[in-house]
Amino acid sequence: MQIIAQPPTAPGTQAPPSFAVTASVSLQTRRLRTLKHEDTFAVLNAAGDIAHASEAEGLYHRDTRHLSYFAVGINGTRPLLLSSMVRDDNSALTCEFSNPEIRDETQVQLEQDIIHLSRAEFIWQGVFYQRIAVRNFSNSRKRLKLNFAFAADFVDLFEVRGIHRSARGHFHPPVISSSYVQLAYTGLDNQTRSTQICFDPQPSRIDTNHAEFALDLEERGYSVVHVAVRCNQSGGRRRPSSAFLSGLRASRNALHQAASQAVSIETSNDIYNEAARRAIADLYMLMTHMPEGLVPYA
């Protein structure tokens, strides 16, 4: 059994727990996926996680990495990736998972392929939304733990690309409530940046770098957890579960409206048509509102 290396953490904070990974985990998880809206973008692996802070993966807002690690597990073990797809309009990433066989020292806790996870992720107005649906396909009740581990290093894009800074700002003590954790950092520019990781419903356990849900799933039963990661936002916001659908609808409508203004290219070659459609969708995902108008971010 291979254990994922711990990501770097801020001074004075606990390292998020590693999730055990069975040898059958697909190499597909190393293929990167990208989501973006305005000044916020995420570079994720194919499972929708942020697992390698030493590379480009992360959630970025206005050129600062607000999440350097984010991973989901079942009973402390990474689920097995079945499929991963970014929608044709680039509005959302959808991933499907099954559970590996999970054992303790004496017995099997969960048989393989009886728990299904469906994960949807998108970005809208500085918030990274996630919806994780957990379904029990067995003929008996199953109790399991849905784990989240996270960290924020607040490095800028130049540091991500390898530039070493001789001095950095300071991290603030994490703020922990029953349903969210807020991480904050003040840079040498005296600007404070914050990441608020909100869960809905309230987790069974929550601390600086970890949240855990104790799920009791009836035969063929299911449960849903929503997460909202807010960049430089705090307080007075809607619950993640209510904001998820309205945000996703608004995100798709905005992309469709922008793309509808583009020139349509259609030929007798279906492969070329698909490439042109894909290029237009990619271009409009990169568009960002500036005072001078729409500008593509590369």
Q: What would you call each of these model-derived segments?
A:
Residues 89-104, 185-189, 279-282, 287:
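Membrane-interacting alpha-helical segments
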Residues 257-298:
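Substrate-binding groove/exosite segments of carbohydrate-active enzymes
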Residues 29-31, 39-40, 53-108:
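A eukaryote-biased signal for short, well-structured alpha-helical docking elements
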